[in-house]
Amino acid sequence: ITDGEYKSLAVISEDGPDQFWFVVERTIGGATKKYIELYTPEIFLDSMISYSGSATASVSGLAHLEGKTVQITADGAVHPDLVVSSGAITLNYTATDIKVGLKYVSKLTPTRYGSTSNAGTPLGKMKRWNKIFVRLDTSAIPIINGQRPPVRSPGTNFGNEEPVVSEDIEVRNLGYDLDGRIEIEQDLPLACHIVSIFGTLSVGD
């Protein structure tokens, strides 16, 4: 959760997936307020509202986010962050499908490497990932150990949505440490479906 506290949770079972409803307490404009929010796993924003209709650059109905910096997707593309003022925002361009909400960062830290070899245990030795590959399925490119590979491909024209990818994303030469840890973060309001993580690791003495 971003910028607030969970106060209550209810799970409603219906046809299809269970629904998760929360009472969330947030401070808006210096006042403490409680909101009822529905968890939607396909939406990657907190306290989100959506608009679908004729092309517009103005989104209102954001009084519950007054003064907050919000993330936005416009027709599937990430729009620069904006600050809510008078319960509204104005985009840099028009769109027909807009989602607005609070940013959160999803993080994945796999178990550290500890497999033995003919050289013995790697524990207590300096390690370096020469290459890390993260296999994605229909996902936006995440940050891998502090690096985000290029998000846009040369063939995508500006003003067009960058399609999500289903491929192996590579980062190289990540420096030495004792743990050889991998950390993957997604700070964009887009999907991040990780199929596997693999690469080449050097272990020192």
Each language-model region and where it sits:
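Beta-sheet repeat architectures centered on beta-propellers
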Residues: 1-205
